Amino acid sequence: MIILDENFPESQRQLLKAWRIPIRQIGVEISRKGIQDEEIIPLLLRLRQPTFFTLDDDFYSRSLCHARYCLVCVDVAQYEAAAFVRRFLRHKDFDTEAKRRGTVIRLSHAGIFLWLLHSEKEVSLNWE
């Protein structure tokens, strides 16, 4: 299940829908508007295999790694967010929910940076 934070711009949400990427957005299809950051992790733990995309870099923390979800911080301009979500979901290392679970990821023009569950070092990957 792909979840967008409520801070994702409507234009980017519509692009993802136009590309037929099945998404649910906090405050639209799931939960409520105004949900606090500290309420998001408990919400994700109640959902089935969620991948959560946010523009909020506060979620890029090794301490947030958990086997039941994936957190993805999209660190690009707002108007590029949908393109980076699609690019990430097509990446061979992250193209299934099983491959994504247990990671906290930051997407940027420079590449993909991630924390893996039980890992002591940040990993970086190139876009392919």
Region spans (language model):
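Hydrophobic beta-strand scaffold residues
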Residues: I23, T51-F52, L71
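Short beta->alpha connector loops at strand-helix junctions that form conserved
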Residues: G27, L55, V74-V76
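Acidic, metal-binding active-site segment of PIN/NYN-like and related structure-specific nucleases
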Residues: L44-C65
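Acidic, PIN/NYN-like endoribonuclease modules and their adjacent C-terminal/linker elements
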Residues: M1-E6, E10-R20, E38, Y60-E128
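Residues lining hydrophobic/aromatic ligand-binding pockets adjacent to catalytic sites
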Residues: I35
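A short beta-strand-loop structural module common to alpha/beta enzyme folds
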Residues: P22-S31
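Histidine- and/or cysteine-centered catalytic micro-motif in compact active-site loops
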Residues: N7, V28, D56-D58
